[in-house]
Amino acid sequence: MKAEFKAKFGAKSAAMRGTLGALAAALTGMAALTGAVVLGPNGSAGASEGSRLDPDLPAPAVEMSISRQPEDPGKAVNLTLDDGPDPTWTPKALEILAASGAKATFCMTGPNAQAHPDLVKKVVAAGHRLCNHSVSHDTAMDRKSVAYQGKEILDAKRMIDEASGGAELRYYRAPGGAFTPQSRQLAAAHGMRSLGWNVDPGDYRRPGADTILATVERQLANGPTILLHDGGGDRSQTMQALQNLLPRLKEQGYAFSFPQA
């Protein structure tokens, strides 16, 4: 009986290993076609962050790994605002930031920057930094071809550069954190370090200003880079939360920094 069980179990185990091996090979092949990587909840690419360079792409000019740590030593946060610029909410964000002496990184889509070059210039003039957030905000970019990813990144860079008058564009944030090794290499080759996040209160879902604030404070233990939005819809709740958040952060001894570039 024991020998029979062992024979049956061994056969099933071998078959299962074969099935899992085939599945892993298929997934690896699929990833190779698109450069896709499995991401964590904070825009992290896990082990793939140390992936090899693609010889068919230009060499990186800056660090390829995804940035989340602040430039400033000590207790600091990185405020980031996505999906703008927006003619209603970006000026409000600038006003709130100025009132607290805070700095932020604005992750702009190319078309929005192109439509509102005056706002792009105001962001730069106020001492904030710019980040490339692609052209079409395609959160499935990591499942598209490398050529598609490159066009999204470089077309957005051109639009933002033109809108800003050539201000430094230090970062690239993939929509939804849909980074690939190739997109990170392409961005780095053009001077943009990939930018992740640690804190995501889901403000784009409009859960209420108090909920946004409470979630940010709870998630700060995850790390210093806070993801908020100044574009893509009604951001009144985000602005209210930001207005309440900044004085609290200062009271708790946080400095306002920029992500390492």
Each PLM stretch: what is its role?
Residues 1-78, 95-105, 222-261:
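Terminal accessory/targeting
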Residues 50-144, 152-159, 169:
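Active-site beta->alpha N-cap acidic-glycine motif
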Residues 93-95, 120-122, 145-146, 186-189, ...:
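Short, glycine/charged-enriched secondary-structure capping and boundary segments
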Residues 94-107, 129, 146-177, 185-188, ...:
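CE4/NodB-like, metal-dependent polysaccharide N-deacetylase domain
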Residues 110-113, 136-140, 175-178, 200-203, ...:
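Short histidine/acidic/glycine/proline-rich micro-motifs that form metal-
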Residues 132-134, 195-198, 225-230:
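Short beta-strands and strand-loop turn motifs
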Residues 178-219, 253-261:
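His/Asp/Glu-enriched short active-site or ligand-binding loop at hydrolase and phosphoryl-transfer sites
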